[in-house]
A protein has these predicted regions:
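A structural signal for multi-pass alpha-helical bundles of membrane permease subunits
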Residues: 12-280
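Short, Lys/Arg-rich, polar N-terminal cytosolic tail immediately upstream
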Residues: 1-9
Length: 280
């Protein structure tokens, strides 16, 4: 047996140990949140945070949805509605813009694209105040329209990702469609979009996760309890009730579960998006 063959099992074992340790470190905060949410406030205050709940109680989850402290059910529904509307707008407008930048010929196309892409370097906090003033002048403060409007018309990252994928589609396919009499819209809808379903699915997942976790804009543009989303509703529990951590962790657990389900179901698509962005 050569030295290389002897060290291979040790290297594999070391890699496995590192991966297990990384997985445990990643899951530890979520596990601690779940355990804390199943404790009564008295038990949490009198025992170690790492102790198991004894007895197990779901009172914190019942409190979330009974409306006595915060209308978490409405926040959950509003978050879902916000994500669906933003997702639809982002996909529609990003696909159209990306196709124009990838396939259509017009003066200044590449310059306009790179100028648009350069806005990725602008931190989001820089545009918050101008966006807020625009929404106030339009009378959209503390409305659902004001909550979703700034994100409806696509994003530079989405346009970039789709444009790079569209450019990789063989031009022979779109040329053949035009020869058969298909116009721009028909070529886009019947040729390009069906071939781009993997990257569109990836973009949809990223959009859902990003906007379900959006905190700063909902906090600024809305007030009161009527238009609270999951992030702002969870944050309000900390100051309003002197940081009842068992209730807060129950809220964070409920907020995380849908996103974790989406990530676990479509994690391969998320990895594919990174590969597509890197190789194209």
């Amino acid at each position: 047996m050569t030295s290389a063959s002897r060290t291979r099992p040790l290297a594999d074992a070391g890699t496995y140990v590192v991966q297990v340790a990384a997985a445990l470190l990643t899951l530890a905060p979520f596990a601690l949140s779940v355990l804390t949410s199943l404790k009564a406030p008295v038990q949490f205050a009198s025992t170690s945070p790492l102790s198991l709940p004894n007895p197990v109680t779901v009172e914190n989850y019942l409190t979330l949805f009974d409306g006595s402290r915060v209308d978490f059910g409405s926040a959950l529904g509003l978050t879902a509605a916000m994500v669906v509307v933003v997702l639809a707008g982002q996909l529609v407008f990003s696909i159209m813009a990306a196709y124009a930048f990838a396939r259509l010929e017009f003066p200044g196309r590449d310059l306009l694209f790179w100028v648009y892409l350069a806005t990725l370097m602008v931190p989001p906090v820089v545009t918050v105040v101008p966006l807020y003033l625009m929404m106030v002048q339009l009378g959209l403060r503390n409305t659902f329209s004001g909550l979703v409007l700034p994100y409806l018309l696509g994003s530079p990252y989405a346009v970039f990702l789709l444009r790079e994928f569209f450019r990789g589609i063989p031009s022979e396919l779109t040329d053949a469609a035009r020869i058969d009499g298909a116009g721009t819209w028909r070529t886009l809808l019947h040729i390009v979009v069906p071939l781009s379903r993997p990257v569109i699915a990836t973009l949809a997942i990223i959009t859902v996760v990003t906007h379900a976790n959006n905190f700063l804009w909902p906090l600024i543009i809305t007030s009161g309890d009527e238009l609270q989303v999951l992030t702002t509703a969870t944050a309000s529990l900390q100051g309003r009730f002197n940081a009842n951590w068992t209730l807060v962790t129950a809220a964070t657990t409920v907020a995380m579960l849908p996103l974790m389900a989406v990530f676990l179901a479509f994690s391969r698509r998320i990895v594919d998006s990174i590969q597509i962005t890197g190789f194209r």
